[in-house]
């Protein structure tokens, strides 16, 4: 196996793949012996799907050593042609005919990506006749990995970079510092790695629960690590060989608790473990910032440097004499202007050396220099607004592109952050809204998938969370929107998962479980229930009479219509056998749909409690109402009606932000909205004490006549999430 073959396939200097036990897997993977590539098909199983391609009948036969040799061959021609500038630096044209293989691009980057496509097309010593004209949709196609919460070795970072290059991702955002540990050397501040690169517990949650203390490297049980300058230079070069730019991130002014363990004088309290925010009024802060950022710029040649800027706790600034003094000196009216000030200082340092600053969307401010880049994470609106103002923007909205969120039902998956981003949701993300004009559109540089690692303690787990969702990110970032199709992507994905697994990657396997999507039609007073499964090689069968589905049950082929109530049980079947769990859900077009719901303890509408949509597997999906403390909410049915059942569903989650059940819920009824009578109290059940997602339904049965329904909620141990109020 010659070096150029390995280089083209992204496996240079990969110790993991050179272990003897993996040799067969390497050969199998590189030669693409998967049977799915041996079939006569009229499409190509390439990810990301090319901009244009025309598949012809027939194959060009060629052995791997000839195809991937660095020696000249009349059968394979790779040409850099400046006349192809219309395709940009990363575009290419690939022609496979009976006469041989021709690959053209206007740069070496374009040739590289063409070779990655050729790699995916090659199987069984042949390549299909095809003409491909391809270029990326976005210039920024990124993945972020947090190495502070859990440390990943140099070789593990290289492995991630390899797989990014295979799927034409070109930006590796390296989150190097945070509360969990400082991960690189700074000569002027040696205590950063001496005192805060190692900690008392490996697992983030155990470490945090036990006080979050850092230890020296020689202390028994010390966990963590850092990258030497030579490590970083090696990784930067390694990435550059694969046409990947590394964007380093150093957190300012928040998320910096670890810094003050090493240098407590840089925080307002001047004590270790006293907070996570730099003292903006302290001159030493800016000396530190300048030294660190200059070190970063010496190590990383990237045009852009990320300075964080997110989730800054400003409480310490309010009572800090130095911060107050700076506010007076600079005529600041608001404490938040201090945030703008310190971000501006970072911006100046970077600009002085010809670099551009990136920050999370909290830095978006009219005073910001237009050379700075906004990374929009709390949704899309901040990014859209910034693009309209002329800022360049990278979109990474958490509800679509956070790959540390659950990717399947939380009760069956490893612990994760509390969001829910299954691969279909990642894939169906539309980065450019229709409302964005062409001028603003040009400021959207691209997208990025983020992998925060509070719940990801090792490389096997990182692989599981990253793959195959990273492939979805890659196709959204590269392929034209009109060429993208979830059905097509899902059909292509299976063979790629097999190849990743053959190469030793611990991928997530597409779920066999059934999920539902509900459309509410308030005009026709009905629900339409769509059933779906991630796997494409199964059929869905269901019952609507409460019985367990079998291979003889109705085959799902169109949305189910609900005009009153319907109990659906469904399952995925393959060759007559059930795959995964049986899906069970009651659907109601109930009396409360479309009715007014008002919180009596705060001036807020509870519209989504009566919209007919059932909450999903995350309290962040827009169908749950998230509340704190005792609450009351009142539904107005519009007129007196007979009511026999009122129910609500509540969430318990012992991971991430945590959701708690209310201690009790009381139901009350009224006809005039003033005089209420109680219909009963339901108290919290003792659910399993496990981190996984669980639910409790608070159900009230009886026979009442009323116009108004009030629910009095007695708070649990923290934040609560309530689903639809169902009235029957």
Where do the model's predicted regions map?
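Short, compositionally stereotyped local motifs that mark structural "simplifiers"
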Residues: 38, 480, 484-635, 642
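Active-site neighborhood of glycoside hydrolase catalytic domains
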Residues: 259, 265-370, 377-380, 384-385
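Surface-exposed loop/turn motifs at beta-strand-loop junctions within extracellular Ig-like
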Residues: 107, 572-576, 715
């Amino acid at each position: 196996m010659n070096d150029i073959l390995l280089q083209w396939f992204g496996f240079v200097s990969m110790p993991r793949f050179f272990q003897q036990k993996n040799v067969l897997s390497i050969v199998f993977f590189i030669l693409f012996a998967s049977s799915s590539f041996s079939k006569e098909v009229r499409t190509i199983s390439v990810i990301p799907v090319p901009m244009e391609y025309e598949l012809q009948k027939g194959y060009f036969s060629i052995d791997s050593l000839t195809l991937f040799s660095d020696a000249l061959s009349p059968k394979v021609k790779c040409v850099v042609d400046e006349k192809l500038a219309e395709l940009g630096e990363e575009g290419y044209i690939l022609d496979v005919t009976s006469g041989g293989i021709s690959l053209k691009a206007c740069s070496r980057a374009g040739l590289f990506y063409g070779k990655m496509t050729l790699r995916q097309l090659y199987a069984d010593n042949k390549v299909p006749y095809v003409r491909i004209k391809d270029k990326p949709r976005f210039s920024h196609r990124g993945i972020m990995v947090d190495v502070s919460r859990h440390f990943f070795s140099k070789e593990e970072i290289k492995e991630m970079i390899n797989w990014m290059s295979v799927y034409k991702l070109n930006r590796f955002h390296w989150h190097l510092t945070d509360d969990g540990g400082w991960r690189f050397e700074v000569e002027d501040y040696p205590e950063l790695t001496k005192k805060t690169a190692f900690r008392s517990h490996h697992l983030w949650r155990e470490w945090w629960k036990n006080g979050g203390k850092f230890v020296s490297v020689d202390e028994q049980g010390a966990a963590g690590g850092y990258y030497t300058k030579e490590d970083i230079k090696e990784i930067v070069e390694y990435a550059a060989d694969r046409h990947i730019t590394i964007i380093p991130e150093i957190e300012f002014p928040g998320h910096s608790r670890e810094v003050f363990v090493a240098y407590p004088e840089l925080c307002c309290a001047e004590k270790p473990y006293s907070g996570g925010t730099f003292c903006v009024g302290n001159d030493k802060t800016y000396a530190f910032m300048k030294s660190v950022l200059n070190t970063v710029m010496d190590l990383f040649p990237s045009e852009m440097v990320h300075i964080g800027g997110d989730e800054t706790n400003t409480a310490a600034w309010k009572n800090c004499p130095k911060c107050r003094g700076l506010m007076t000196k600079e005529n600041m009216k608001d404490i938040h202007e201090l945030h703008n000030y310190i971000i501006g200082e970072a911006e100046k340092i970077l600009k002085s050396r010809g670099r551009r600053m990136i920050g999370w969307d909290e830095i978006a401010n009219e005073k910001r220099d237009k050379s700075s880049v906004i990374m929009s994470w709390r949704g899309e609106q901040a990014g859209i607004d910034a693009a309209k103002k002329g800022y360049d923007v990278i979109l990474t909205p958490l509800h679509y592109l956070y790959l540390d969120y659950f990717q399947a039902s939380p009760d069956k998956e490893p612990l994760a952050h509390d969001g829910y981003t299954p691969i279909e949701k990642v894939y169906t993300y539309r980065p450019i809204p229709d409302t964005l004009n062409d001028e603003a559109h040009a400021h959207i540089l691209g997208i990025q998938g983020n992998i925060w690692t509070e719940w990801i303690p090792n490389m096997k787990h990182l692989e599981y969370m990253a793959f195959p969702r990273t492939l979805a990110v890659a196709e959204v970032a590269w392929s034209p929107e009109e060429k993208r199709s979830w059905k097509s992507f899902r059909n292509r994905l299976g063979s790629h998962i097999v190849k990743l697994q053959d190469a030793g990657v611990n991928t997530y396997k597409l779920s066999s479980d059934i999920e539902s999507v509900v459309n509410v039609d308030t005009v026709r007073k009905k629900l339409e229930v769509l059933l779906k499964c991630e796997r494409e090689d199964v059929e869905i069968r269901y019952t609507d009479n409460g019985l367990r589905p079998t291979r003889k049950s109705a085959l799902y082929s169109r949305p189910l219509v609900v005009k009153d109530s319907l109990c659906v049980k469904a399952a995925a079947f393959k060759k007559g056998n059930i795959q995964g769990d049986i899906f069970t859900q009651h659907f109601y077009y109930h009396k409360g749909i479309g009715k007014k719901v008002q919180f009596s303890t705060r001036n807020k509408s509870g519209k989504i409690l009566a919209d007919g949509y059932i909450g999903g597997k995350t309290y962040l999906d827009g169908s749950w109402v998230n509340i704190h403390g005792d609450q009351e909410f009142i539904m107005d049915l519009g007129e007196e009606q007979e009511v026999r059942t009122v129910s609500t569903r509540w969430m318990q989650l012992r991971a991430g932000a945590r959701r708690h059940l209310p201690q009790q819920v009381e139901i009350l009824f009224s006809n005039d909205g003033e005089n209420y009578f109680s219909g009963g109290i339901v108290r919290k059940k003792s659910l399993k004490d496990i981190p996984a997602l669980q639910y409790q339904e608070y159900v009230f049965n009886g026979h009442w006549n009323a116009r108004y329904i009030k629910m009095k909620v007695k708070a649990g141990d923290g934040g609560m999430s309530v689903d639809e109020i169902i009235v029957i």
